[in-house]
Amino acid sequence: MKRYRLIGILCVLGILVVLCVFGMPSSPKNLGRAGTLPDIYPDYIGVTIPADIAPLNFNMVDDDIDRMNVVAFGSKGGEIRSKGKWADFDIDEWHQLTEQNRGGKITFTVQVEASGNRIQYDDFDVYVSPYSLDDWGLTYRRIKPGYEVGGDIGIYQRDIHTFKEYAILTETVVPGRCFNCHTANRTNPNRITLQMRGEGGGTLIQKDGKQTWVETKTDVTQAAGSYSYWHPAGDYVAMAVNSVHQSFFTGTGQRIEVYHRFSDVEVLDTRSNELILSPLLFTDDLEIFPAFSHDGRWLYYSSSKPCRVPAEYEKVKCSLCRIAFDAEKGQFGEVVDTLLNGPVTDQSYVLARPSYDGRWLMYCVSSRGNFPVCQDDADLWLMDLKTGESRELKEANSNQCESFHNWSENSHWFVFSSKREDGMYTKLYLASIDDQGKVSKPFLLPQRNPKKYYLEMMDAYNCPDFTKTKVKLNAHEAYRQVFDNKRENVKIR
């Protein structure tokens, strides 16, 4: 009997040893408490994320550490861990944890080991939104912010549920060309456009896998179309027709001013390659950045009075306007509504983007100009289309430039470009919005090793947009089409 009792005691002791070694965190004598939140990069403390987003991996701002131990546990259950030079969570475990805690929160405990000491910081929370983000990923343009030369410009896409990035079309495939203004139809990449500047330039229109290059410049319109936006029915594309110029500052804190000597708005019928024009959108004023309403009945755009640019660049004040559009007849209305008057308020309103549920209109506000990515004071604002009331999105803005933005398919998430980190490089941030218009703290697009990635990848990210599925574009076919110089010409309806 004593023998069995001894065996039992030894078994219990063995189990306790195993638990101590593998199941319980060690508590060294030199464990200290910082009494503060950890200084992490990116700053994910208090952000709201969708379930199934890529893991919120993070680094300590101070690189002088030996190891970081992180435990993440959910308010509705589940726990995952990471040990290493930075917080690097397993993707499958992370997705399971976020799904389990949809509508709840995940609490992070961070311990840092350095020079034989271990410091534990105060816990912080990340909230998991009840709103899904079902889109597959993001598309965006990557460009060196050097201005004088194009460099390796490219249109890329990113699976937001993992860390995988794919090139759609880059300058290495089609040398010497500048790609811009890529636009999917309400996040659906079965309808997508892309503009190419330079020799042999044109507009690529892809519908259900068929690629067509169109020359949108005519004797009447003076220039090719750009800044495009699809009509929700998928047959029309609104575009601006303009000339783009740059001026550089010396001896000031400003670097560049982008301006247009002329700018008008048109609509292309992609079925017939006909341009639909209106005398109300081809005036001496500069009309720019068109965007259709969620139901396609209105076309929003910005308009500024002509002035002598670049000398009078500070006088460029854009108003936010709209005009009716009849998709069945392919006709514009006869009245322009001015929603926000730039000269009266001494502000500039550009880049209007209506949510796909018809509730909100997001736009940029700055003190001048029609190219907000170059304005340090550019901020995001939100108009309630039910009431017409507008407010600044203080929850999302910073003391640096916020500019290009777009909505997720369900209109509960938006992505935008921001220079908040250093005032020079635009990076992509995501935030949620609820039914009352409350916006969450934005979070930087996750990367596997974020500090290494963002410090070494010296690109600016702009023109972000969501896509519900992966963009399928044949780059080899695009190369052939670019250099065969065959373009379908448009005509005026």
Could you say what each language-model-derived stretch is?
Residues 1-5:
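Positively charged n-region of N-terminal signal peptides that target proteins for export
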Residues 8-32:
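Bacterial Sec-dependent signal peptides at the C-terminal "C-region" and cleavage site
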Residues 24-493:
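Sequence signature of WD/YWTD-type beta-propeller architectures
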